[in-house]
Curated annotation (Swiss-Prot):
Domain of life per record: Bacteria
Gene3D superfamilies given in the database record: 3.40.1350.10
Organism: Vibrio campbellii (strain ATCC BAA-1116)
Name used for this protein in its record: UPF0102 protein VIBHAR_00890
Pfam families per the UniProt record, alphabetical: UPF0102 (PF02021)
Database matches in InterPro entries: Restrct_endonuc-II-like, tRNA_endonuc-like_dom_sf, UPF0102_YraN-like
Family: Belongs to the UPF0102 family.
Length: 122
């Protein structure tokens, strides 16, 4: 096993993604929102839109890109978890703009790809 746990490595890349998105002008709202259904890594606001962010990282693309790691099951969990977060914030998914983005990180953080509207609810 390596020097760092999977969670520590995940936190490191989430921090990198958070800093990257803040530099892009997004306003940070929440991190590691956890429910029985699932977890959302980062939550931001861009203008009037709430942005739920899944952070994925890969050492290399040998087994696919980081963005390809977001499965259909994961997408469903993200949507349900986002609805819970919105409800706790007294916001309705029916009258607020929101989207799901992926920040894909490769090459130990030297390559960051921000994919907006990466996940659909369908």
């Amino acid at each position: 096993m390596g020097l760092f746990s999977k969670r520590q490595i995940g936190n490191q890349y989430e921090t990198l993604a958070k800093q990257y998105l803040q530099r892009q002008g997004l306003r940070f709202l929440d991190q590691n929102f956890l429910t029985k259904v699932g977890e959302i890594d980062l939550i931001f606001q861009q203008g009037e839109t709430i942005v739920f962010v899944e952070v994925k990282y890969r050492k290399n693309d040998s087994f696919g890109s980081a963005a390809e790691m977001v499965t259909r099951a994961k997408m469903r969990k993200l949507v349900k978890t986002a609805q819970i977060w919105l409800s706790q914030q007294k916001r309705s998914a029916y009258n607020i703009d929101y989207r799901f983005d992926v920040v894909a990180i490769h090459d130990s953080g030297r390559d960051i790809n921000w994919i907006q509207n990466a996940i659909s609810e369908g």
